[in-house]
Amino acid sequence: MFRTLVTGADTFLVETPMTSRTLARIFALLVTLVPLSALPAAAQMDLSGYWNREGDADNGYSREVVDLLGLPVSADGRAKALSYDIASLSATERQCQMYPPTYLLTGPFGLKISSEQDPITQKLLAWKIDGWGDRDGTTIWMDGRPHPSKYAPHTHGGFTTGRWEGDSLVAVTTHFKMGDIKRHVSFSSDRATMTYRFTRYGDLLTVTGILEDPVYLAEPYVLTEIFKLNTGGTGFPLTACEPIEELPTLHENPGLVPHYLPGENKWTNEMTQNRGIPLEAALGGPATMYPEYRKVLKDTYKMPAACKVDCGTPPAAPAGGRGAPPPAPVPGDGRGAVRQAR
């Protein structure tokens, strides 16, 4: 800083040591007065990029039709699962329906995450997670906007807002339609809420989801998946879904919805018959989520005498198909040896 010095007709700017020291003190004071609330912005992580799925957790697939083991279903959630018939997906209006937000953690694909800034202020407006062929895209709004009314229309992707907690992005999704928790086995209602935590550790991204549903769940259901950054990633191919005639009976009877009436699901005892899992365990519930549930089963579980499914041996070759043994020579044909050699 300078001081003006006037001598006769001349004017000089003279630097004063006292002023420089004062300026240094003012600067130091300003640094100490910076609000602590502004500091977490430096800790916010960059989540953008292509992320490949790395985890080997339960991906939501089930070999048995009725497999609610480990799911905290309520009585209504169990009734919904037992009434469901997967043939309903062959109805024209259901063939192209998408999975709910939980599919981000249970689906087979990776993530493509990008950010959206205000074009003038460059302030972060939202994080965007691209959709797949059977999952809607997710926009995580970071500008503080409120969630819509509970009466607002619901979509497959829902409405999501986010905030930073330290270096973790916490996102809450509401207003999504009823959909699968475990693919084609159990379901979440349109009153469910999904809370995500995105935490980055170098080139690894841990995503934890907590699903809460007052209708079909008796307790929150927790899912976790790990993704790894792929610096050479490319976009996910999105293909159009076109309904076709899969089951003629459904197209001949447009109002028909395949289902099971109470007590009529013929697959209810499948896990018990194939794997020896007691029926009360196969029907799920909060207790089946926890390791100590093994103590409940130890007196009732009996290992099947012989393996019935997933026995570790390759399936038999189809008769006459690829991999089938060559046909035996035809006696007196004269060409049998040649045909067998081929």
Q: How should these model regions be labeled?
A:
Residues 7, 15, 32-35, 331, ...:
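N-terminal non-cleavable signal-anchor helices
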Residues 42-342:
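PEST-like low-complexity, intrinsically disordered acidic/proline/serine-rich tracts
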Residues 3-5, 38, 44:
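N-terminal start and proteolytic maturation junction detector
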Residues 2-6, 12-29:
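Bacterial N-terminal signal peptides that target proteins for export
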